[in-house]
Amino acid sequence: MTAPLNPSAPITVEVALGDRGYDIVIGRGGIESLGRRITALRPGARTAIVTDRSVAKHWLPRAQASLDETGIAHSTIVVEEGEVSKSYAGLQQVCEALIEAKIERNDLVIALGGGVVGDLAGFASSIVRRGLDFVQVPTSLLAQVDSSVGGKTGINSPHGKNLVGAFHQPVLVIADTAVLDTLSPRQFRAGYAEVVKYGALGDSGFFAWLEANHAEIVRGGAAREHAIATSCRAKAGVVARDERETGERALLNLGHTFGHALEAATGFSDRLFHGEGVAIGMVLAAEFSAERGMMPAQDATRLSHHLTAAGLPTRMQDIAGFKQEGLADADSLMALMAQDKKVKRGRLTFILMEAIGRAVIANDVEPAPVRDFLHRKLAES
């Protein structure tokens, strides 16, 4: 691993997609630079800020002030906080508001918020006037290291998570690390699961660094910015090689097949944050891999131990209300996984593991062993 980067200067990570490439700018004070960066990127553009009620209280005034200082016209669209907005109704609200604001194809949409806002605003941008450019200003750790990068946008369906959407790359990502200071501990932990994912799937050295430096990452400063930049570089590299997820990019879904099914089973509610579902999903994927003889059992245990040490759930029994409200049975979870975006010709595709730092795409997994595995895991005390 390289030494942590100097937090006093912004870190720039390039997403190399030719004429559709863009920069991820990481560092404190990014929101204050929003107006200046947009002026340089798109002189004369008007903007529409899409945000949620919670983010609006903390960060909308700073974003608006930055735009005002550079004379950029702006309107604001505020949606409800949480997955409830990542819906057909939420999409209609944002699309109609963009049309009413007369945002044109030479203007910019600004997604100021976490993963829900970024996915929603990005998808609306992809379809209004057959395509508006947008800027991601992610305000959660999860969004900064994952959902704001790579162009996946969309909403949920009653049938499952992220089933309606489009690939639509942003033109700029501004990851202001100062906003992370206002996250609740639970929100920060949920985002940290996605950071761990990058080490687990492709960088054993980064995983070991996370084990040694987790406390420093929580405290902030150079270690936190290094973790974010390393995660963004990992994702940017994969996206540049496989933008449309025809191969390698599927590895970034480690933990997501199980995790998305658990999110759907809990009604996309606050019982289980997305990152928490990914944490449980990664452990399930690792343990299933170990049972198949693909991965040393001690590596699966090591992954589980680090996530537990970070305060994340690692078992389905850790989901809020599991004992009182229960959870879907194995057959119901299998039905939810059958709606996964990675299903091809009706066959499940899993991201499994051979070791810490080495994930693989498995297209040959029969449903019966997965169902039996889930049944046993659900029955654990």
Curated annotation (Swiss-Prot):
Sequence positions that bind Zn(2+): 194, 256, 274
EC category: lyase
GO cellular component labels: cytoplasm
Classification via CDD domains: DHQS
Subcellular location(s) per record: Cytoplasm
Keyword annotations from UniProtKB, A to Z: Amino-acid biosynthesis, Aromatic amino acid biosynthesis, Cobalt, Cytoplasm, Lyase, Metal-binding, NAD, Nucleotide-binding, Zinc
Any coiled-coil regions, as ranges: none
Cofactor(s) demanded: Co(2+); Zn(2+); NAD(+)
UniProt keyword annotation of Nucleus present: no
Cofactor note: Binds 1 divalent metal cation per subunit. Can use either Co(2+) or Zn(2+).
InterPro entries assigned to the protein according to its UniProt record, in alphabetical order: Dehydroquinate_synthase, DHQ_synth_AroB, DHQ_synth_fam, DHQS/DOIS_N, DHQS_C
Matches recorded under Gene3D superfamilies: 3.40.50.1970, Dehydroquinate synthase-like - alpha domain (1.20.1090.10)
GO BP: amino acid biosynthetic process; aromatic amino acid family biosynthetic process; chorismate biosynthetic process
Keyword set includes Metal-binding: yes
Source taxon at top rank: Bacteria
NCBIfam families from the UniProt entry: aroB
Family named by the database record: Belongs to the sugar phosphate cyclases superfamily. Dehydroquinate synthase family.
Role summary: Catalyzes the conversion of 3-deoxy-D-arabino-heptulosonate 7-phosphate (DAHP) to dehydroquinate (DHQ).
Name of the protein in question: 3-dehydroquinate synthase
Source organism per UniProt: Rhodopseudomonas palustris (strain BisA53)
The gene coding this protein: aroB
